[in-house]
């Protein structure tokens, strides 16, 4: 408190007790920064005990002397076959002197860089206190007595003084002016928006500048899109280019899902009301009946380049070469050289005229594996070019893979992880938890999921809403949302067992494409959700086991979601539940632009 009072007394000259109080002396309010007398700014070299040129000479001499001495000793040890780690006291002193002089010289060359910051910090405040209006007002109001603290009587009235608060000089930080210039250059097109990160070296600042430039160019506000609170360095060169913010999606928890004897709390990122609640009800029914079991049928990512020949015969020659078991070991060695985890499993070929499509399948460890398999395929193509010089590589992907598209080849052959998950739901659980009966569920499944989907010409869509659960889990755990297309391929089967009392329900999903490393899995939120499931990162004990476990959890969650939705439809509760949990109460006319 005394420090603050002294700072006020230095501004307002207060007379001693008994003297005539002259008018209060107030500092003249500066109108410009250069109108205020400022003390000389300190220099970085002021901290040195000797003049700068003497200090530099001493350390330069020490540096080169000890370097010469250590080099001579090093040559002598080599000549005498003395181990280098055996050092004398003089050598230890020389090493210490070398390190000290090197650190000094390294710091000396940084003085020019440090100087502007030390100069600027000493000019930040005219009065020697923080440049804050609120702080100035508090300090001025805190001490309003007309005599020094020590001379003030106990019962002395303290007449209020109305000091004139000096407004701080508005000094914009240099970065703001610089940012304004960059924003203008982006708007004018002289600075590419995509180059801001490399130009500035600050991902958050680049996103803020890009965001402001976008608002000025489009004349649309992005006030509702958050900017702060996100690590933009974590997505640089990996997840997203030219960011201007991030989208918030709520994450709910369904479960516990009892699967293969273990309980899982399943994170689901969604904006669809009732989805998490419905999946949670399915988990409850499965849990009450002893849980679900899963089987992993296949684990292989695929990539299918397309090549062209001068004739169909030459395309067939390569097809026969690739499918010949005698050549597989050679091709596998070439393919596997690109990664520790990518192991070639098989090659399936298809011909269309003189064009050949080669579908390579390989294991990819705990990664989803698209980059891994693409590198391996490129190695094989380079190898084949020697024996088939007339082969024209049209593309590393020829859509026979098939990635992010509904395709029969994925439905039949599988892609990623192929999983079957099943459970037996007791009659009393069907009635109490699911509010329906076994016969109604079996009939609905046949007419809706099987016959209805066949009438619609569905491809892998023989289910109620597998895509809902897959999308929600994918968003929460950092998977590629676009791969929901083939990952949601699912056929849901329901059958009455035990004389029609109990329900056997299963989901078969041939192409679940997931990974626990790479891509969006390394983001903080998604990494936390993976950690919740116990599958974060790569498994050191059994490479690939985390990704396989995640695939079975996805299938188990789909099983719970299918069971609950089908029960709601069979019981006639779908409309009521969605009106309760999934209906917007906002006036949409006010939200329209």
From Swiss-Prot:
The chain crosses the membrane at residues 52-72, 94-114. The keyword Glycoprotein applies. It is a multi-pass membrane protein. One of its GO terms (molecular function) is hydroxymethylglutaryl-CoA reductase (NADPH) activity. GO terms for cellular component: endoplasmic reticulum membrane; peroxisomal membrane. Its EC number is 1.1.1.34. Pathway: Metabolic intermediate biosynthesis; (R)-mevalonate biosynthesis; (R)-mevalonate from acetyl-CoA: step 3/3. Residues 1-36 are annotated as: Disordered. Keywords: Endoplasmic reticulum, Glycoprotein, Isoprene biosynthesis, Membrane, NADP, Oxidoreductase, Transmembrane, Transmembrane helix. It catalyses: (R)-mevalonate + 2 NADP(+) + CoA = (3S)-3-hydroxy-3-methylglutaryl-CoA + 2 NADPH + 2 H(+). The active site is at residues 272, 404, 480, 578. Catalyzes the synthesis of mevalonate. The specific precursor of all isoprenoid compounds present in plants. NCBIfam families: HMG_CoA_R_NADP. This is 3-hydroxy-3-methylglutaryl-coenzyme A reductase. It comes from Camptotheca acuminata.
